[in-house]
Amino acid sequence: MSTIVKICGLTTADTLEAAVEAGADMVGFVFFPASPRHLDIDFADALGRQVRSRAAKVALTVDADDDLLDAIVEQLRPNWLQFHGSESPERVRSIKRIYGLPVMKAIAVAGPDDLSVLPDYAAVADRILFDARPPKDATRPGGLGAAFDWKLLDGVNLKLPFLVSGGINAGNVAEALRVTRAQGVDVSSGVETSPGEKDPDLIRDFIRAARAA
């Protein structure tokens, strides 16, 4: 299976087109007001229509309530839901049942103890995303450009695909994939010139490097 490449936090038509044309498998739209990549649903819908069927549309939320999820699913019609908050395994199972959509659950990693929740989430999610645990004073759970110790994933043996994120860019994506043996990578800040400002050239460089890894 080829490496799954996800570009997350896209906010403009130009950067979305760069990601899709370069061969991204998944494109992520963020629905979390504290993030500089936050989109309102109407604009996300316009970007989603631009994607057509060229990549999977991923709706990223953080502890979203049912009303927000209803609106996102009805208007954007995403292919995937990504949960980046403290959603419980029971919540993941319930939402999958309600919407009939696959779910990718992010697990924040700083040390080995953070992996203790993995079996419970692996039993209900369709993909797992390992991301760096943010500082306690952070206002958002991801997209901070911080990496975790990839060697912590030594011995992780999942029956479902998993992706890695956090501090990954074109210069280190090959090493991230080699060390973690992940089936995919998810990048946001690693293809930006400033928070929320994606760069088409950095997107293309990242996808090229991930494919060559």
UniProtKB/Swiss-Prot annotation:
GO terms for molecular function: phosphoribosylanthranilate isomerase activity. One of its GO terms (biological process) is L-tryptophan biosynthetic process. It comes from the Bacteria. Keywords: Amino-acid biosynthesis, Aromatic amino acid biosynthesis, Isomerase, Tryptophan biosynthesis. It catalyses: N-(5-phospho-beta-D-ribosyl)anthranilate = 1-(2-carboxyphenylamino)-1-deoxy-D-ribulose 5-phosphate. It is an enzyme of class 5 (isomerase). Its EC number is 5.3.1.24. Pathway: Amino-acid biosynthesis; L-tryptophan biosynthesis; L-tryptophan from chorismate: step 3/5. Belongs to the TrpF family. NCBIfam families: PRK01222.1-1. HAMAP family: PRAI (MF_00135). This is N-(5'-phosphoribosyl)anthranilate isomerase. The gene is trpF.
